[in-house]
């Protein structure tokens, strides 16, 4: 019955001239090709079936889980593997710092990915761009697993490693914003934060999977086997996860908000230029509002793993287990913060979590520096729980700052510029501060980052969308 009704409507469009007017009156433009002149199979056509909530949430979750899995296996390898295999020329401390420098490179690639993928996400559509971002990230990760080491090709090895890391950053720069929009632009009223937290859950899930596979490998393999070939397994195995993500995302249709943007001809020619020229204040404040989130997370993961297994003398396996326990608290507080955000507002929850992060900075050194297992576990659990409280509503809060026409670009840029400011140098800077001034200096680093973010959140007044987008995302 539905098929006959659609066919009848299409014939009516054709005979009335609406279905072919764009081809008769003028050549087909990019906008016309997206409208497809009433093609009922076009995902942008309003007569198409909508995505089911379960499919949307699973697609937004599975993609970010894969992307963060790929991202974190590099972070773990940058501490445990790459200093020995790709930077063996200097002492252990110098090799670790050089390895962490390649880790930081991806954060500078992420805004580039935001601009490139954001352009197509705001011009062509969310679905196709998400598929391209996933492929970029997946290919870069698999190539890392196939790289020869320094002993085989010399200085070319770290250069190729850095190039692949840059590719990872490009892919993740385009992934996060699209996944958040896929969820929030399909969300019913009053549940934007709840839907928006599903892509955020990809971070703890990806971390648990990446840490779990390294733990399994260290349990099954000898150190020699692990450093000869075992470390490559997580990178190569990510290809299977990418295929799963592609299968799920290729079955989606376009989001309702982007469909309306096409129908109302609201797309802009250069989204990144529009964001920079028309929303500069929003871009800067949004970036600073997300900075403490990045600083905290990469101190709790990359820096803590490095310092715990060197200065504190923890065995690699033991510390990875402690981190996995801490990440469980991260995963539990993400949905909790999303529920609170839908009731109290995103900004209120983010301000409360940021103030708690500032307090945490003062207890960082006593807890982590004690060396006591319970103290270290308390440090990891508390820090990562606070991370979940600030991370849960962050995606929705950043997406709400921009209208549909530039939302993919705007939200992605703010998030990934915050990655440069907050995360790119955080492990490097914390390692240097701890080595020279002690862990108290790292705690003050957290206090400073939290203070900047709190000031930005107080200054940032969430903006209502333009009237033409009043049915799209609502400010909590």
PLM regions: where:
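C-terminal ends and interior cores of transmembrane alpha-helices
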Residues: 135-153, 356-370
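Cytoplasmic membrane-interface "Motif A"-like loop-to-helix N-cap segments
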Residues: 123-134, 343-354
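Extracellular/periplasmic helix-loop-helix junction of adjacent transmembrane segments
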Residues: 79-110
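Extracytoplasmic gate region of multi-pass secondary transporters
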Residues: 75, 281-329, 423
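Multi-pass alpha-helical transporter architecture, strongest
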Residues: 245-250, 449-476
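Glycine-rich segments within core transmembrane alpha-helices of 12-TM secondary carriers
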Residues: 194-218, 415-426
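Helix-to-loop junctions at the C-terminal end of transmembrane segments
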Residues: 114-125, 334-345
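A membrane-interface helix-boundary motif in multi-pass transporters
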Residues: 219-236, 430-448
């Amino acid at each position: 019955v539905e098929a006959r009704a659609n066919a009848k409507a299409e014939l009516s469009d054709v005979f009335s001239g609406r279905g072919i007017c764009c081809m008769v009156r003028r050549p087909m433009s990019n906008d016309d090709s997206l409208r497809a002149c009433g093609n009922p199979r076009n995902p942008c056509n309003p007569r198409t079936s909508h995505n089911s909530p379960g499919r949307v949430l699973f697609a937004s979750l599975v993609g970010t889980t894969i992307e963060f899995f790929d991202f974190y296996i590099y972070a773990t390898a940058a501490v445990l593997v790459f200093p020995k295999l790709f930077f063996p020329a200097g002492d252990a401390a110098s090799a670790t710092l050089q390895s962490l420098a390649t880790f930081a490179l991806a954060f500078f690639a992420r805004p580039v990915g935001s601009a490139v993928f954001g352009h197509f996400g705001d011009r062509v559509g969310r679905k196709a761009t998400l598929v391209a971002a996933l492929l970029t990230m997946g290919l870069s990760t698999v190539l890392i697993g196939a790289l020869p080491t320094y002993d085989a090709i010399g200085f070319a090895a770290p250069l190729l490693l850095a190039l692949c890391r840059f590719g990872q950053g490009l892919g993740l720069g385009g992934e996060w914003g699209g996944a958040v929009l896929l969820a929030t632009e399909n969300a019913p009223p009053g549940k934007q934060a709840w839907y928006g937290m599903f892509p955020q859950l990809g971070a703890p899930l990806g971390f648990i999977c990446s840490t779990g596979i390294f733990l399994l490998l260290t349990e099954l393999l000898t150190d020699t086997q692990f450093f000869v070939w075992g470390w490559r397994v997580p990178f190569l195995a990510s290809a299977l996860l990418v295929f799963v993500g592609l299968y799920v995302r290729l079955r989606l249709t376009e989001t309702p908000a982007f469909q309306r943007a096409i129908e109302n001809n609201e797309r802009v020619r250069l989204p990144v230029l529009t964001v920079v020229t028309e929303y500069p204040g929003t871009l800067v404040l949004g970036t600073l509002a997300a900075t403490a989130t990045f600083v905290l997370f990469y101190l709790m993961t990359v820096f803590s793993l490095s310092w715990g297994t060197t200065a504190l003398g923890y065995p690699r396996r033991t510390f990875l287990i402690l981190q996995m326990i801490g990440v469980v608290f991260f995963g539990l507080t993400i949905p909790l913060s999303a529920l609170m955000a839908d009731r109290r507002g995103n900004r209120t929850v983010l301000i409360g979590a940021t103030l708690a992060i500032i307090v945490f900075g003062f207890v960082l050194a006593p807890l982590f520096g004690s060396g006591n297992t319970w103290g270290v576990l308390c440090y990891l659990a508390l820090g990562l729980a606070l991370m979940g409280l600030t991370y849960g509503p962050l995606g929705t809060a950043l997406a709400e700052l921009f209208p549909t026409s530039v939302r993919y670009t705007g939200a992605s840029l703010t998030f990934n510029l915050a990655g440069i400011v907050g995360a790119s140098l955080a492990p490097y800077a914390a390692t240097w501060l701890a080595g020279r001034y002690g862990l108290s200096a790292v705690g003050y680093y957290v206090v400073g980052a939290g203070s900047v973010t709190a000031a930005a959140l107080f200054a940032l007044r969430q903006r209502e969308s333009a009237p033409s987008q009043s049915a799209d995302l609502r400010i909590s």
